[in-house]
């Protein structure tokens, strides 16, 4: 009888020992499998894809953008140079386009692997870019400036620069202001500087005593309001060369309709 009891106890011990080993082996195998699985949340994973929206600063042979407000990319840098690797580039209609087709102010959806090189501008490599919109307000400012630029072209004769007072500009980031100034440089092929009348006089650029800007004209946009819903800007504007050479208008309006900006002048003046 005692032998039978001993055999039963021995059998139970062996069963428990064998089960414990099996559980331990199973647990180790599970950990090994988890360690070998890739972390799909890792932005450095070559197969991962990250997208963000950005606005075009410059485009052509290369692409420079500024990330949208609140994006992780903006935390890295306010300017990003986008490298091209077998790029897929589409317009808003899904048609293939080239970098040369992009314009300053275009809003892009950019796909990349999540890697941002720390430099200034920061650098990424993109595999796909899609145009999803455009900043029409930038074009609105350019339209207002171009309208006054073409008024009384005699004031523009024999100049070397265009000075712009940007202190009254609204609804624009500093980079968007730079986009406008860069676009002016390309459009008019003159040196573009910024400053108020007094700032330019303090720098000796404007002769304050004789009220004369020998080498340029001074353009001022002021009294600006913007209705984003109707895409309408109200403004006053002036172009100044001297005390006896200036033009402008007050309470003018710029409206975006049918894909373009139109200017309606308010009360005009000349001196």
Residue ranges and their predicted role:
Residues 62-64, 234, 262:
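General beta-strand recognition
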Residues 22, 27-33, 38-42, 53-58, ...:
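Flexible low-complexity loop/turn motifs enriched in small/helix-breaking residues
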Residues 93-96:
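Short, solvent-exposed loop/turn positions at domain surfaces
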Residues 1-29:
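Sec-dependent N-terminal signal peptides of Gram-positive bacterial secreted proteins and lipoproteins
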């Amino acid at each position: 009888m005692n032998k039978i009891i001993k055999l039963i106890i021995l059998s139970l011990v062996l069963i428990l020992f064998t089960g414990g080993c099996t559980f331990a082996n199973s647990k180790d195998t599970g950990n090994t499998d988890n360690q070998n699985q890739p972390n799909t949340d890792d932005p450095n994973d070559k197969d991962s894809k990250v997208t963000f929206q950005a606005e075009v600063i410059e485009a052509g042979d290369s692409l420079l953008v500024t990330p949208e407000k609140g994006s992780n990319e903006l935390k890295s840098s306010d300017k990003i140079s986008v490298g091209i690797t077998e790029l897929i580039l589409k317009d808003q209609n899904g048609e293939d386009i080239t970098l040369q087709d992009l314009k300053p102010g275009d809003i892009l959806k950019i796909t990349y692997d999540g890697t941002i090189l720390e430099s200034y501008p920061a650098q990424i490599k993109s595999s796909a870019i899609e145009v999803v919109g455009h900043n029409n307000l930038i074009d609105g400012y350019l339209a207002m400036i171009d309208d006054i630029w073409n008024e009384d072209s005699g004031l523009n004769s024999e100049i070397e620069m265009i000075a712009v007072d940007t202190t009254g500009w609204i609804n624009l980031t500093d980079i968007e202001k730079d986009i406008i100034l860069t676009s002016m440089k390309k459009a008019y092929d003159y040196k573009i500087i910024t400053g108020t009348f007094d700032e330019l006089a303090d720098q000796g650029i404007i002769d304050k005593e004789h009220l004369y800007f020998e080498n340029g004209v001074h353009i001022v946009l002021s009294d600006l309001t913007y209705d984003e819903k109707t895409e309408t800007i109200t403004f006053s504007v002036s172009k100044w060369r001297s005390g006896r050479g200036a033009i402008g208008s007050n309470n003018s309006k710029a409206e975006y309709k049918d894909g373009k900006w139109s200017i309606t002048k308010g009360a005009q003046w000349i001196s």
